[in-house]
């Protein structure tokens, strides 16, 4: 169980508060953009070298459309659908923020130094709670703050775009793999 799973569970057990679904969900108010903004960021995860299928963006988008059109699938109640979408969006947000900050590779599988173990920071409940507070205060700013800000990381993102434009060859696969490994290492936070 990850820190963000613990925080997610604790939040919904202790509070009766929605982050994503509110009165504006079925109206034309701008606040509806929050869920759509989250789906935008999740849908563009490939800019970080992560498989775009890592998050269930299409599934969540389809469920949001069901809510907006009040067109429920057979056997699904509105309450259940709202709860599912709320939970999925919050779980995806916490996973996204924590993994962009501390890395997608599980800590037990990291070999950051073959001779000396270099201690790494991990996503803890304090960070995950702060991420929820940030989401509550200003969702769009929270999404932007979650993005890695290192100039080296941005350079690697530019290089990834360039390499992806080369097509598929043994050379590009080799180069892309090395680039993806270095992008992951750049996300790690050293203690």
Predicted regions and their residues:
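Auxiliary tRNA-acceptor-end handling modules of aminoacyl-tRNA synthetases
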Residues: 1-191
């Amino acid at each position: 169980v990850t820190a963000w799973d613990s925080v997610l569970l604790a939040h919904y057990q202790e509070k009766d508060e929605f982050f994503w679904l509110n009165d504006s969900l079925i109206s034309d108010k701008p606040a509806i953009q929050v869920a759509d903004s989250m789906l935008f960021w999740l849908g563009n995860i490939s800019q970080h070298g992560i498989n775009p299928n890592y998050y269930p963006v299409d599934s969540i988008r389809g469920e949001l459309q069901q809510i907006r059109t009040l067109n429920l699938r057979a056997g699904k109640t509105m309450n259940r659908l709202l709860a599912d979408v709320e939970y999925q969006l919050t779980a995806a947000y916490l996973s996204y923020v924590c993994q962009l900050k501390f890395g997608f590779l599980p800590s037990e599988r990291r070999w950051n130094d073959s001779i000396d173990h270099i201690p790494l920071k991990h996503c803890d409940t304090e960070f995950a709670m702060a991420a929820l507070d940030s989401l509550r205060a200003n969702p769009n700013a929270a999404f932007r703050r979650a993005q890695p800000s290192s100039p080296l990381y941005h350079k690697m993102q530019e290089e990834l775009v360039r390499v992806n434009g080369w097509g598929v060859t043994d050379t590009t696969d080799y180069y892309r793999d090395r680039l993806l490994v270095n992008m992951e290492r750049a996300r790690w936070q050293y203690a």
